[in-house]
UniProtKB/Swiss-Prot annotation:
Keywords: Methylation, Ribonucleoprotein, Ribosomal protein, RNA-binding, rRNA-binding. The keyword RNA-binding applies. Part of the ribosomal stalk of the 50S ribosomal subunit. Interacts with L10 and the large rRNA to form the base of the stalk. L10 forms an elongated spine to which L12 dimers bind in a sequential fashion forming a multimeric L10(L12)X complex. Coiled coil: none annotated. GO terms for molecular function: large ribosomal subunit rRNA binding; structural constituent of ribosome. This is Large ribosomal subunit protein uL11. One or more lysine residues are methylated. Forms part of the ribosomal stalk which helps the ribosome interact with GTP-bound translation factors. The lineage of its organism: Bacteria, Bacillati, Bacillota, Clostridia, Eubacteriales. Belongs to the universal ribosomal protein uL11 family. The gene is rplK.
Length: 141
């Protein structure tokens, strides 16, 4: 018989740097999950992606055990990493902070593809381009 699910927790954490401090501790503590167990497992699985923010969906079961699924980093994080930016533009329609080539957009889209609701790489690229534009990044043809 399958275990009964009692909760789903969604968090965005620094890869390899999960600690029992907020936001991890309180989110897991209210479901009775072993916080240190999660932190060690998460840090071990994400050690190779240091510096990125990794979304994680934690499923908590009735016996207080848990499982989690790692997602790909948010598109904005990948764009900032590709361009070496600290943050996007405060006024994206006026101030541009950088520009991406089509090849860079395609690389980001291929990384994000498993988590995007896109049928083809072209539609995934359009989604990434939209995110880039809203951050004040121009797309070169």
């Amino acid at each position: 018989m399958a275990k009964k699910v009692t909760g789903m927790i969604k968090l965005q954490l620094q890869a390899g740097k999960a600690t029992p401090a907020p936001p991890v501790g309180p989110a897991l503590g209210q479901h009775g999950v072993n916080i240190m167990g999660f932190c060690k497992e998460f840090n071990a699985k994400t050690a190779n992606q240091a510096g990125l923010i990794i979304p994680v969906v934690i499923t908590v079961y009735q016996d207080r055990s848990f499982s989690f699924i790692l997602k790909t980093p948010p598109a904005a994080v990948l764009i900032k990493k590709e361009l070496g930016l600290e943050s996007g533009s405060g006024v994206p329609n006026r101030t541009k902070v950088g520009s991406l080539t089509k090849e860079q957009v395609k690389k980001i889209a291929e990384t994000k593809m498993p988590d995007l609701n896109a049928a083809s790489i072209e539609t995934a690229m359009k989604m990434i381009e939209g995110t880039a534009r809203s951050m004040g990044v121009t797309i070169q043809e």
